[in-house]
Design a protein with these regions (language model features):
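Phosphate-binding P-loop
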Residues: 46-53
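Conserved lysine of the Walker
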Residues: 66
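Conserved substrate/cofactor phosphate-moiety recognition/catalytic segment
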Residues: 71, 75-114, 140
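A glycine- and Lys/Arg-enriched "phosphate-lid" helix/loop adjacent to the NTP-binding pocket
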Residues: 139-213
Length: 257
């Protein structure tokens, strides 16, 4: 009979009192974690900015609004800005004065500068926005200048050889936004408004010819280079302020998501 008494003791030890102090649920009413949303203001830039690292490039005719958009995206999303290398280009003014003499030289200059941009973008550990793509030069400007007689067959072939060699291992944009402005008058008005001295000689026919090449450029980007492209008609939309600005930023955010 001593054995049953030994069994009863363990039962009394495992009695419910110990679980009762499981007043550990008391800490659960700690609604402290929900306060973490207060950290959201870290995104002082814009809450809809893409979270992962992105390389976005902007394409479009001269005066289409790429520079304005690139600066705005840099400020709104916190992207590193890579401006079009126009201001520092030593051949640009001569080019618009005598296109036949300076077209090949200018295209090589732009190619070298844009490849340098791509190398820098590869080393930057944040999202980047580039004002004008590397691909517009071989697919639009070089072909157009050759068609106008400003580049010889030999110069065009040599340019493409340089392009193939220099762009072989560069990082490509994740996405490209192509700005479309059908009206040459709007382009000319924007060019005059920004007042770059070296662009004063740009004529209506030159811009109209470029527009023809930009029509097929998005398809070339996707099929030849495997880069996704969003086409935006910005002829009448003012993306600098108000509702136009918000709609533009929302479109870009959705495109990059």
């Amino acid at each position: 009979m001593p054995r049953p008494s030994a069994r009863k003791r363990p039962r009394s030890v495992a009695s419910p009192p110990p679980p009762a102090p499981a007043a550990t649920p008391e800490p659960t009413p700690s609604p402290a974690p929900p306060e973490t949303p207060a950290r959201k203001p870290r995104n002082t830039v814009r809450t809809k900015a893409p979270l992962s690292r992105r390389f976005l490039a902007l394409a479009g005719n001269i005066g289409a609004g790429k520079t304005t958009a690139a600066k705005m995206l840099s400020q709104s999303f916190g992207f590193e800005l890579f401006d079009e290398p126009v201001i520092d280009n030593r051949f640009l003014r001569d080019y618009y004065t005598d296109m036949k003499r300076w077209s090949f030289t200018l295209q090589l200059e732009f190619l070298i500068r844009r490849v340098e941009h791509h190398e820098l973008i590869h080393s930057v550990r944040k999202s980047c926005v580039q004002d004008r793509t590397l691909y517009e030069d071989p697919e639009i400007f070089a072909k157009y200048l050759h068609g106008l007689g400003h580049l010889t067959d030999s110069e065009l072939d040599l340019y493409y050889e340089y392009f193939q060699r220099l762009s072989r291992n560069i990082v490509r944009p994740d996405k490209v936004i192509c700005f479309e402005v059908g009206s040459v008058d709007i382009l000319l008005d924007r060019i005059r408004t920004r007042g770059r001295e070296e662009e004063k000689g740009i004529g209506r026919d030159f811009l109209r010819g470029l527009n023809g090449y930009y029509t097929s450029f998005p398809q070339v980007l996707q099929e030849k280079y495997g880069v996704d492209c969003l086409v935006l008609d910005v002829s009448q939309q003012d993306i600098r302020r108000g509702r136009g600005r918000e709609e533009f930023l929302d479109r870009v955010s959705s495109f990059l998501a």
